[in-house]
Amino acid sequence: MKVAVLGAAGGIGQALALLLKTQLPAGSKLSLYDIAPVIPGVAVDLSHIPTAVEVKGFAGEDPTAALEGADVVLISAGVARKPGMDRSDLFNINAGIVRNLVEKCAATCPKALIGIITNPVNTTVAIAAEVLKKAGVYDKNRLFGVTTLDVIRSETFVAEAKDLNVADVKVPVIGGHSGVTILPLLSQVEGVSFTDAEIAALTTRIQNAGTEVVEAKAGGGSATLSMGQAACRFGLSLVRGLQGEANVVECAYVDGGSEHTEFFAQPVVLGKNGIEQVLAYGEVSAFEANARDAMLDTLKADIQLGIEFVK
């Protein structure tokens, strides 16, 4: 099993690489790429950790060598948010980066499962899809927007609010991956009930958690460590699915035939071909239905921005 991380020298990329080095199945290969010249050194640094995962680093303009034979590609390359920026401000820089990297994936590892971490995910996933379509290799079951950070934040905040064991908390998160498009389905959390005020407060905190980190870091970056953990969880789930493990379910932003928008975050079953099955997200409360319906114009506009960028 070969996993490639593109943008591996950044804050998310290094955290993700460390976690993958310690958690990938024995015998796996970890391929790290970045435009920054430090990345071969990051690979050497990681190679001293005693796990049976081979690590190689590739620097420079061309990621082809890093991508050869990759089963999973996780893309975290791009610039991070700073105070005063929202995820859409990142579009002007990150759109071109994602386009160029996905073009290389299409040419080098067209069957790989691709997880897009680079923000704004609502838009960058649409860019990736259009690039893959242009190359004639698009498979909607092999492209994912990684929204796992919204899930782990939801699980953490609910466990804290209700004094639960976080390992027992499961919160599906649907929609997209920015602001109002992030919708945790708190009505579906088992064995716990919330007041209307709690639901409103938790939902807002989950939606604004990225900004909470950006402001707390005071200009020193955005959510890198928690995002690295979230991306590792999702990447390992992709690997487990590829290896034939049953019942591997994660929420992800996918082209899953949603009635709402072309791309929509919802639970999916992962398997040997990427998405084996898109799961219905089930019954929602009136609050959640209203929040879902209110986000759709924003989400559609984000998606259209990505489509237009590639055209």
From Swiss-Prot:
Recorded coiled-coil stretches: none
Record InterPro entries: L-lactate/malate_DH, Lactate/malate_DH_C, Lactate/malate_DH_N, Lactate_DH/Glyco_Ohase_4_C, Malate_DH_AS, Malate_DH_type1, Malate_DH_type1_bac, NAD(P)-bd_dom_sf
Residues annotated for NAD(+) binding in this entry: G7, A8, A9, G10, G11, I12, G13, D34, N94, I117, T118, N119, M227
One MF term in the entry's GO annotations: L-malate dehydrogenase (NAD+) activity
Keyword check for NAD: yes
Enzyme class: oxidoreductase
Taxonomic superkingdom: Bacteria
GO cellular component terms given for this protein: cytoplasm
Keyword Lyase on entry: no
EC number assigned by the record: 1.1.1.37
Sorted UniProt keywords: NAD, Oxidoreductase, Tricarboxylic acid cycle
One record GO biological process: malate metabolic process
Catalytic activity: (S)-malate + NAD(+) = oxaloacetate + NADH + H(+)
UniProt-annotated binding residues for substrate: R81, R87, N119, R153
Active-site residues, record numbering mapped to chain: H177
Function (record text): Catalyzes the reversible oxidation of malate to oxaloacetate.
Complexes and interactors: Homodimer.
Family membership noted in the UniProt record: Belongs to the LDH/MDH superfamily. MDH type 1 family.
Protein name as it appears in the record: Malate dehydrogenase
Organism: Shewanella halifaxensis (strain HAW-EB4)
Gene: mdh
